[in-house]
Amino acid sequence: MARMGGSASADIEAPVDEVWAVVEDVLIAPDWQGGVVAISALERDAEDRATLVEIENDIKVRHVKTRVRFRYEPPTVLSWIQEQGDLKSVTGSWTLEDLGDRRTRATYTLDSDPGRVLGMLIRGPVEAAVRAALVNARPGELKARVESQGR
C-alpha cells in the first residue's frame, strides 16, 4: 500500500459560522472524532488558535503520533500538513460551503502515506476499515457534533 486517503462530505443543518467554530477548535477533536486519542498544542497564533499540535491516533493496527501544522482561512478552510511523525506524510483539510438557509456542506479531505512498515500492516480489509474511520466517518461526526450543539 502506498498512499491512503480520500474525500467525503456531509450537509449540516447549521450556518457556516457555527460549523467553523467546531472545525477551528482543533483541540476538542478527541471529543467528537473517532480514533483521535489525544491532542495537545505546541504552538499558538496571535488569535490563540493551535497552529502546531501533537496528535495521537488509533488507526486500528496501532497508535500513531504526528506533529501537524494548521493553516486557518476563516470561515471556510482549515488545512494541515504533518511536520513530523510516525507516518511518512499527511495532508488534509476541511472545506465549508455555505448552502444558504442555515445549511453548510462540510468536505473532509485526507492524503497520507503510511510508509513502508506501517503500510504493510494496513492492507485489504484493514485498509478499508482505516479509510472508513479516518476519512469517510469524519463529515458525519462533524454533523452530529454541530447539530447536537444547536439543540
Indicate residue ranges for each PLM-predicted region.
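Short strand-connecting beta-turns/loops that link adjacent beta-strands
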Residues: 15, 46-48, 75, 99-103
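A structural signal for short, well-ordered beta-strand segments
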Residues: 6-12, 55, 94, 108-110
